[in-house]
Amino acid sequence: SSAASDVYKRQGMYNIGVTRELYIFECLINNVMEIVKKAGAWIPFYIMTSDKNYDDTTAFLKEKNYFGYNAEYIHFFKQEMAPSVDYNGKLLMEAPDHLSLSPNGNGGWFSSLCRYGYDKQMKEAGVEWLTAFAVDNVLQRINDPAFVGAVIDSGCDCGGMVVRKADPNERVGVLCTEDGKPSIVEYYEMTDDMIHLKDENGNLLYNFGVILNYLFRVDKLMAIAEKSLPLHVVEKKVPYIDENGTEHKPETPNAYKFETLILDMVYMMDNSLPFEVDREKEFAPVKNATGTDCLLYTSPSPRDKRQS
C-alpha cells in the first residue's frame, strides 16, 4: 500500500514536462503502475493533502482521470494542522477569527490517515506493509519488489531507501544505528568530525542519505500510533495579520512551527533496513528554488545518466 505527502500547494500538480505535459502526480502514479502491472493487482493508494490544497488536488486528479489508476483504490485524507507562534510566543492569526495553521510535519501522516478510518480499512483488506514517500521525487520506485522483498526477508520492522551522498556536506539525513535502535541523524545535527569520519576502508561512515521513501509494517505502525511523537520547533516564514487587520508576508523567518517528523517513527521501530538505490536513476527531488534540486537544474554530465 502507498501513501503520498503533498506538502506544498499544487506541488503534485506541477507540470515538469519539456516537450509535452508531464505532471509530478503523473510520474508517481506511472511508477506505481509498473508494480500494479507486474503484480496483476491494484494497490491501495492513500494521498495526503493539506486543508489548503485538498480541493485542488482531488479536482485535478479527477479531471485527469487519475492518470489511468483505478479510482476505487485511491483514497484522500487531510493532514492535521498545528498553530504557529511568533518569537514572543504569541499565536499568529491568518484572519481576524482564524489562527494561522500549518501542516504538522511529515511525521503526522499515519495519525492523520487513522483519523479518516483508513487503518480499519487496511486491516480489513489484509494490508501488512505500507510505503510512505514524498511527493517531490519523480524518479523514485514505489513498492519496488526488490526493496519490499529485502525488508521482509531481513525480518526488520521497516526499511528506508538511501543514496550515497553527492558530497560529505549534502543536506540529507543519514540512516544509522543509535543505542541499538534505528536512527536518522539530520544534517544540521552532524558535527564537522562526524561529516568527515571514515571507516577502516577509507569510506565516509555517515555516507548514506535518506530520500523519504520508507516501508513500514502496518502492525508496528498501529502499535506506535497511540504514542505521542516529539515536537520539533522549526523557524519559518509565516504570513499573518496584526491587531489592525494589516496583512504581513515576511521575507525572513518570523515564527516557530511545531512539527512531528517521520524520523521519530523510524526510531520507534525495533530495527530498520537501509536499502541503497542509484541516485542517478531514482533520486530527482523537485523542491529547491535554485541549485542541485531545483526544477531548472541541468546535469553537467555530457550524457543523460538517467536513461534506463
Model regions and ranges:
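Active-site-adjacent bridging/hinge elements
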Residues: S1-D6, D86, T191-D192, V233-K236
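Short loop/turn segments at strand-loop or loop-helix junctions that form parts
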Residues: S1-S5, Q79, V277-R279
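Conserved small/polar residues in nucleotide/adenosyl-binding loops
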Residues: A3-Q11, Y297-K305
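A short acidic (Asp/Glu
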Residues: K9-R10, D55-L61, Y87, R141-P145, ...
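Conserved N-terminal catalytic core of the sugar/cofactor nucleotidyltransferase
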Residues: R10-V127
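Catalytic core of tubulin tyrosine ligase-like
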Residues: E128-W129, L139-N143, A150, S154-S299
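Active-site acidic Asp-centered loop
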Residues: F133-A134
